[in-house]
Amino acid sequence: MLLQQIFNGLALGMGYALIAVGYSLVFGILRLVNFSHGSVYAFGAEIAMVFIVSMRLGIIPGILLSMLFTGILGILIDKAALEPLRKKGSPPIASLITTIGISNIVTNLLIIFLGSEKRNFPNFFGHSGIHLLGGTVSMTQIMMCVISVILMLILVFIVFRTKIGLAMRASQQNAKAARMMGIDVNFVIRFTFFLAGVSAALAGVLIAGYYEIVYPNMGFMAGLKAFSAAVLGGIGSLPGAILGGLIIGNAESMAVMFLGSTYRDSVAFIILILVLILRPNGLFGRKGITKV
Amino acid sequence: MKRNAMAVSMLLLAAMLFNAACSAGSGAGTTAAKNESGSQSAAENSGMDSAHPIKVAVAAPMTGDNSEYGIGFANAAKLMAKKWNENGGCLGREVQIVEYDDKNSSEEATTIAQKIVSEKDEIAGVIGHFSSGVCMTAAPIYEENHVIEISPSASHPDYSSIGDYIFRNNTVISKEGGASVDIAVNDLGKKKIGIISIMTDWGTNTSGIIKGILEGMKDKGVELVAHEEVMEGSDDYSAAIAKLNDAGAEAVICCGMYNLVAPVAKQYKRVNPDIAIIAFSNAYSTQLLELGGDAVNGVCFPVIFFADSEEQSIKDYVDAYTKAYGAAPSALSSQAYDSVGMLLTAIQNVGDTDSEKVKDELYKLDYHGVTGDTRFDKTGDVDKAFVKVTIKDGKFVKMD
């Protein structure tokens, strides 16, 4: 059973990791914890549901369209709510609180247009599984891991090997200097929100497909736990987000096994508090960053 | 300067939250408005007194996580009001349904209850609220102000004893729990029973009752092997399921709604395809079939309303509901339908909307509705016959 719980924990953790990547991307560039990310993730899954099930566009086009639309939602959020705050030079806390408000708006809009009920989401990879050392790993779990790793490699490539990635890193180090060098910082930020939205949509589709369930409020708890994962891994660091997600997922599985299901949800937040006390920069975080 | 910017951003945030609240509220508002105009035109046709309508409040979650239930209540209530209005109304006055959105939150419910009691001269009674915990925070306010509350869904044992004006058109969970255990032990012949329950007042209480019933069956060789409590809506139950499976459970009693039963069935059947899953009547909804797919085949539960019944009145009701709202009614919506019917019948019998007289009449009433023959006992509870239902090939069928 221990092994089975580890497999379950790894799949769960990959889900958190995929969401945590989005937190890290935005935090890396804006030093802003984007609490609307959970609802963006739910939006990605819901809109994929609309494309795949209601409009019958097929699985791959449906996922791609949902990634595109969710990316655009990310840009819209930045354009409508965060950019005006930056222009005014508002303190970081204002942007932080604004993202919480946006999260409410997105979730409630989803409820108004699609209803609050939980709906069935198609499973893409079937129920076949591989027996391994007495436990069962399902195809979906394996594919979740593979796709997450690919996504992370693509993101790392974009950030460290492309021109726009160079601009992102420059804006991150010193926005004012970057602007003087002719970098359109607002464009870079919008691009980052787009990337975060795309990764959130992919996370939403994979996790909804794994549990075969989708509903507007799915991002709330998942978002908070992914935030813990991002902090544990060192917020702003992409590999840290993945590792943090896996640790949180497994910690939850272990908590259920040794302490009982009742303690499951508190574990992620206990870890969050411990990390903030003992190692505020997380596992991979750089020292000396001023936190929000 | 900095303080200024802070103030501006705070204002912006407040405006946004207000916007969100408004947009959620206006959705419910427009449906209420539509409903009123619809019934008004009906009133003009039949020459009813629509200047002094009898208003029935439906207080339930119309937005948010549990909005499907509240909307179901409101739909069923409107259908019943339409039926009365087509027959000349209640006491010759038009019946109007007024919706209140409590978002299934106790805080909202308290505000709504206070609003309703402040307008109690106009409102004849309240159908709602949805979950037991919310009902129990609102009920003392109704009781104190002598407003009749009939909950179509509360099943917590303590709810109806809050007062004389507090009724429920749902079986108390201790009786339903007995029926669920009966299915597991006698109909399916399982001895090793596991429980998985949601961590709400209702879930914890229900699982406690089931434990007590199983305890009393020890001499028959029935054994409770494991009990796992899970957060409602956490979606991932695989860890709890691994524990139940490890303990050797042959049957699992799911204390939760369709949104627990369907994922548990799916995730459990990946580990153990032979597991028997037993639920409660609140899982009886077509959404269970949609969400659960093949995995919910074989899930059993007791219900007091069964849509595929042979009885003509139930058939007519299901047809009318399906025609109006595009889906068959759930058990809880049907209980809301009957609740409105009982309240209006009591008012008609008394010939007045005076809540004290109507309340006394409700205790005497013998109502034959779509959810069976209903008669309130002295605490305001009902006792109904259960139909055992299972799912076969993606359809609800009676158990043999």
PLM-predicted stretches and their roles:
Chain B
Residues 1-7, 11-12:
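Positively charged n-region of N-terminal signal peptides that target proteins for export
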Residues 2-4, 23-400:
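Extracytosolic ligand-binding ectodomains
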Residues 11-14, 399-400:
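In a subset of proteins, long, contiguous C-terminal domains/tails are tracked
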Residues 18-21:
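C-terminal motif of bacterial Sec signal peptides marking the signal peptidase cleavage site
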